[in-house]
Amino acid sequence: MTDYSIVHADDVDDVYAGTDVPGEFRPLGRALGLQQLGATLIRVPPHSDFEQGTGHYHEEIEELYLITRGTLTMRFGDEIVEVPAGSAVRVAPHTPRSHRNRGDETVEMWAVSRRLGRGDATKIDDFWEADPEAVQHRAP
């Protein structure tokens, strides 16, 4: 027996639609019927502060980010790095992280992790100063 599923990311609801977060967050786990993994497509428009100055970390989850388009500016703890398309980034549990797009092209990235079946993220308010040139809110 062959068991597989195919879903186009744009056919999955953007959970940030209707909010002021600039960008898209499309979790594909349910649509694909994933049992052990979580997979989310994240799109960050040009010159946008996707997490709006906040950050987060996970207690147990190790995350894999796959940058497939654009260059993403990521912060891990006190370090800020530029991550170009074609890069893979592993982030260990308890590592504070956030990201924004300082470039002229939309960033597309995939966040992949094991599925716990419960929330594991802790938000960090005021993780880094908002970029004064970045869009902080979704266009109406």
Model-predicted regions and their roles:
Residues 1-38, 45-46, 124-140:
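A short, N-terminal "cap"/entry segment at the start of jelly-roll beta-barrel domains
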Residues 29-38, 49-63, 77:
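A short beta-loop-beta micro-motif enriched in histidine and acidic residues
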Residues 35, 45-50, 71, 115:
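Short, charged/polar surface micro-motifs in flexible loops or helix N-caps
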Residues 41-45, 57-74, 112:
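Short, conserved beta-strand element in jelly-roll/cupin
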Residues 64, 71-73, 80, 96, ...:
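Structural motif
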Residues 74-75, 91, 97-103:
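Short beta-strand His + acidic residue motifs that chelate non-heme Fe in jelly-roll/DSBH
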Residues 78-93:
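Short acidic-glycine-tyrosine-enriched beta hairpin
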Residues 98-140:
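Double-stranded beta-helix
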